[in-house]
Amino acid sequence: MKLKTLQLENYRNYEEVTLECHPDVNILIGENAQGKTNLLESIYTLALAKSHRTSNDKELIRFNSEYAKIEGVLNYRHGTMPLTMFITKKGKQVKVNHLEQSRLTQYVGHLNVVLFAPEDLNIVKGSPQIRRRFIDMELGQISAVYLNDLAQYQRILKQKNNYLKQLQLGQKQDTTMLEVLNQQFAQYALNVTLRREHFIKELESLAKPIHAGITNERETLSLTYLPSIKLSDMSKGEQTLWDEVITLLNDNIKREMDRGVCLFGPHRDDLGFNVNDMDAQTYGSQGQQRTTALSIKLAEIELMNIEVGEYPILLLDDVLSELDDSRQTHLLSTIQHKVQTFVTTTSVDGIDHEIMNNAKLYRINQGEIIK
């Protein structure tokens, strides 16, 4: 899939702008705080109906404006598709082919993106929350079922935590409601856990050879899914696994009541990275951690192509300067002529000349595009 045009109205520091996109590489160059990252963010937001930089949609609306609008025309294997996102201070509206989508789960997945920003280098050494968000953002784009299960899980988790807090404070005495919530919680927790486990296995199978290529076969990468709910054997039947989950929850009702919070579930999952059988988070060098992060991002691109039948759009936010020549070369070999890419940078110095030869350059200055 390729983004043909991108139009912004009152988005961040852009009053009104139209970008005619190059099918291969689009380089956005400018000083800091001019709007380069805002442009990339708008593409990400158009894809996932949420920003990766803020959870408050109001921040996306230009100062002193009533609304923000993002519109993109997508070229894909079946033809052309317009996508629209309209944001007001009361909420947001999304459209596919000019038809409003009542649920975000119906919208997400039409435009697939992979974002690689400097903070993504923290996927290895950062907090478990960063890794859970990474799983959710990528898996959610290729599986509407996962997105729905996750939304239902988060809804019930919130209800359960509220009820546990009331029990802890003595505002409630009856645990019957908690047992009912656990029944629903167990099903969605199991669904999310199984889909995450399958996703990590697929991602690992693609990341391993990529990582080996970058390191000239000197290093071996492995991924380990670390679920909060530890099941004896995930290949068992769903009913058997559900029984295990509900038993765990029921056995720990008193602990959770004492703590006033849910102690088990996918909201406490983590993902481990091992390089040559050593924990990359604890023992990996900065170079090893960056190679691991790049391998994961390149594997994402391939996995989306396998699952969706088309390559996603790649967003590189000021990250090329963080990669040495070898890593840039492997990045180039993955994206060349098949993945539409948007790159932000303050200077073209250090960008591979092959990337430059196949690119369209846009200069960004105070929310305006100077071609």
Curated annotation (Swiss-Prot):
Binding site residues for ATP: 30-37
DNA damage recorded as keyword: yes
Localization (cell): Cytoplasm
GO BP annotations, alphabetical order: DNA replication; DNA synthesis involved in DNA repair; double-strand break repair; SOS response
Keywords for this protein: ATP-binding, Cytoplasm, DNA damage, DNA repair, DNA replication, DNA-binding, Nucleotide-binding, SOS response
Gene Ontology cellular-component annotations: cytoplasm
Stretches assigned to coiled coil: none
GO MF term set: ATP binding; single-stranded DNA binding
Record keyword DNA-binding present: yes
Principal place of residence: cytoplasm
InterPro entries per UniProt: DNA-binding_RecF, DNA-binding_RecF_CS, P-loop_NTPase, RecF/RecN/SMC_N, RecF_2
Origin: domain of life: Bacteria
Transmembrane segments: none
Protein family according to the UniProt entry: Belongs to the RecF family.
Role: The RecF protein is involved in DNA metabolism; it is required for DNA replication and normal SOS inducibility. RecF binds preferentially to single-stranded, linear DNA. It also seems to bind ATP.
PANTHER family found in the cross-reference section: DNA REPLICATION AND REPAIR PROTEIN RECF (PTHR32182:SF0)
Protein name: DNA replication and repair protein RecF
Organism: Staphylococcus haemolyticus (strain JCSC1435)
Gene that this sequence comes from: recF
